[in-house]
């Protein structure tokens, strides 16, 4: 995994001034798309970020986004069992609904509860993952309280590759992928991905005498198609279509209702279209995207029509612009329109009936955002400021802002300081759960301050960051429904170190935080967040071999008065290049068969193996 100062974008807009600079920089410098929505040299970026490349994903031998995210700094992940089960991500102590997840710069349709279940998204189409920490609502709007993750599936227009892979592992885990990414003429490119995966799984929530012998498996079929074309030196376009159909089993047994095994199905279809214009000192992009996610819930073995059905529709229109005033000053701005609605079904299980005062056909949720940013770089100083206003038909106006400064006080060393505000809009369930409707809820709000020092000494690149995040109006369940009565305070320190020792590349991540829930009479630790974490990723390449290891330490966590002990995990990977076309791969996860819990009452995978073969063409 390559650590950079890379930030995230909703789209790939080019600042010509920085582009011309990029032609002259050395190979060690990187031209990146930043949180400012235009391209910059990495040294000009002030946000703390990491990029995961397609090559990194291959070295990890990741079968899911869960496998990737758990290796990132200041990230805690948890899932209700094994592959395909519902999963959550906690960035710097924030909740899953307080991190914004994008796909090719566009928001994923939100789950009914407001968070994104990234365990349902197929990893086989991913080209790169950009991960930024800290408040970015002044650029992106709602949910960007603790961080932003941009999952990029669009291939470079000059990419010429193809791959067929097949693998088998523990719990009868089978996986096959076909990928073609090829130029189809001058300035034209096509990418197609087809994938299938199935595992029998295991009993993720054993209840003796109720569900003995149950297995909770996962199955997915997914497709991704993309075409891009350069119409001229200045104008290019892209159109993409993606779809996946997932099924996962889970346990719904109880001592009151007896044994009940259920199946959840997730069907997603989305399409996006974009046009980019770049000329001299001006760049512009228009992007349109539509997605629908259907969620079915029914008893296992029965047809999906016999259970509950919920569908979320989302449409996005984004127009971004950037202008280089001179070599020191660049400005940018954007308009974002989004509409989302509950297209079918109920917000809650159908036996609760419809919510009061909510007709999804007559009252979709719409949001219009206007943002502006400026960055000034001169001598050893870099300054930036951004502001955004979101006008939402449910909760009204919300204005966020951020300022940052960077001081390169000595060659190879930089000190950065930033302060910004952020918010999260209530979800459909927060507002309209039948019998507990609270249509007047306000957004959660936060203020984040962070100070970073980075340096490069010989073979070592390092960064240490301290942050302080206050969150108010947190949505907490009270007897009558959700209420804006919660408050949290999260303080933390991160250390990132990257170095190469002979043939081995290392990445070390340490974090200490104090995630405090201040909502009650006494301060408590936020649920399922630990205070301490450590990660080590290492890879060695020699001859035809690539060997890897990943170490993860997770500190103790709490859910109310229940304590979940700390744990350590080791994963090992090996890949052998038979020739230029064939690779043989093997992975051993949880190598020492550690017994641990992510959620109370749910079993995690023990020692697991997975072997695969790749053919490249």
Curated annotation (Swiss-Prot):
Q: Name one GO cellular component term.
A: pore complex
Q: List the Pfam families hit by this protein, alphabetically.
A: Plug, TonB_dep_Rec_b-barrel
Q: How does it sit in the membrane?
A: Multi-pass membrane protein
The places in or outside the cell where this protein is found are: Cell outer membrane
Motif stretch (TonB C-terminal box): 600-617
Chief location of this protein within or outside the cell: membrane
Which Gene3D superfamilies does its entry note? TonB-dependent receptor, beta-barrel domain (2.40.170.20), TonB-dependent receptor, plug domain (2.170.130.10)
Which part of the chain is the TBDR beta-barrel domain?
A: 159-617
Q: Which stretch carries the motif TonB box? A: 29-36
* SUPFAM superfamilies linked: Porins
According to its UniProt entry, one GO biological process term is: monoatomic ion transport
UniProt lists the family membership as follows: Belongs to the TonB-dependent receptor family. BtuB (TC 1.B.14.3.1) subfamily.
Stated role: Involved in the active translocation of vitamin B12 (cyanocobalamin) across the outer membrane to the periplasmic space. It derives its energy for transport by interacting with the trans-periplasmic membrane protein TonB.
Its protein name is Vitamin B12 transporter BtuB
Organism, per UniProt? Vibrio campbellii (strain ATCC BAA-1116)
The gene it comes from is: btuB
């Amino acid at each position: 995994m390559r650590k950079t100062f890379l930030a995230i974008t909703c789209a790939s807009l080019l600042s010509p001034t920085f582009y011309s600079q990029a032609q002259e920089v050395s190979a060690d410098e990187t031209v990146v798309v930043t949180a400012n929505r235009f391209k910059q040299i990495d040294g000009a970026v002030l946000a703390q970020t990491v990029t995961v490349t397609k090559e990194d994903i291959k070295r990890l031998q990741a079968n899911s986004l869960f496998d990737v995210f758990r290796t990132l700094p200041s990230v805690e992940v948890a899932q209700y069992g094994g592959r395909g089960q519902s999963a959550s991500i906690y960035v710097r102590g924030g909740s899953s609904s307080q991190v914004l997840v994008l796909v090719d710069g566009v928001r994923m349709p939100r789950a009914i509860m407001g968070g994104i279940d990234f365990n349902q998204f197929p990893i086989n189409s991913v080209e790169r993952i950009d991960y930024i920490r800290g408040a970015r609502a002044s650029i992106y709007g709602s949910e960007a309280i603790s961080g932003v993750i941009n999952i990029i599936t669009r291939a470079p227009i000059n990419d010429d590759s193809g791959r067929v892979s097949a693998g088998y592992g523990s719990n009868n885990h089978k996986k096959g992928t076909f990928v073609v990414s090829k130029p189809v003429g001058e300035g034209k490119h096509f990418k197609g991905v087809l994938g299938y995966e199935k595992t029998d799984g295991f009993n993720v929530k054993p209840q003796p005498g109720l569900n003995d012998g149950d297995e909770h498996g996962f199955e997915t079929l997914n497709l991704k198609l993309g075409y891009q074309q350069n119409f001229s030196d200045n104008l290019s376009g892209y159109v993409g279509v993606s779809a996946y159909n997932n099924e996962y089993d889970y346990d719904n047994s109880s001592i009151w209702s007896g044994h009940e095994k259920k199946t959840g199905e997730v069907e997603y279809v989305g399409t996006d279209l974009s046009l980019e214009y770049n000329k001299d000192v001006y760049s512009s992009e228009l992007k349109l995207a539509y997605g629908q996610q259907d969620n079915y819930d029914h008893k296992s073995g029965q047809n999906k029509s016999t259970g509950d059905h919920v569908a979320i529709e989302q449409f996005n229109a984004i127009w971004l612009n950037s202008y280089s005033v001179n070599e020191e000053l660049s400005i940018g701005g954007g308009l974002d329109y989004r509409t989302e609605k509950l297209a079918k079904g109920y917000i809650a299980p159908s036996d609760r009936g419809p919510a009061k005062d909510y007709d999804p056909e007559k009252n979709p949720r719409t949001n219009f955002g206007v943002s502006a940013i400026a960055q000034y770089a001169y001598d050893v100083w870099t300054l930036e400021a951004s502001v955004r206003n979101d006008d939402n038909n449910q909760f009204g106006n919300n204005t966020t802002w951020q300022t940052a400064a960077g001081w390169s006080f000595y060659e190879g060393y930089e000190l950065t300081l930033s302060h910004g505000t952020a918010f999260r809009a209530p979800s459909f369930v927060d507002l309209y759960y039948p019998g507990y409707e609270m249509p007047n809820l306000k957004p959660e709000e936060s203020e984040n301050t962070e100070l970073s020092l980075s340096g490069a000494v010989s073979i070592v690149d390092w960064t240490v960051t301290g942050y302080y995040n206050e969150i108010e109006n947190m949505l907490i369940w009270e007897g009558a429904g959700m209420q804006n009565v919660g408050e949290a305070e999260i303080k933390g320190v991160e250390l990132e170190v990257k170095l190469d020792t002979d043939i081995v590349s290392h990445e070390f991540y340490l974090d200490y935080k104090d995630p405090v829930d201040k909502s009650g009479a006494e301060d408590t630790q936020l649920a399922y967040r630990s205070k301490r974490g450590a990660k080590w990723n290492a890879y060695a390449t020699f001859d035809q071999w690539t060997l890897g290891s990943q170490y993860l330490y997770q500190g103790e966590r709490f859910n109310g008065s229940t304590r979940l002990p700390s744990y350590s995990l080791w994963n090992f990977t090996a890949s052998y290049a038979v020739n230029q076309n064939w690779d043989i791969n093997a992975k051993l996860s949880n190598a020492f068969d550690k017994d641990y819990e992510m959620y109370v009452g749910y079993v995690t995978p023990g020692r697991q193996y997975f072997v695969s073969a790749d053919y490249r063409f």
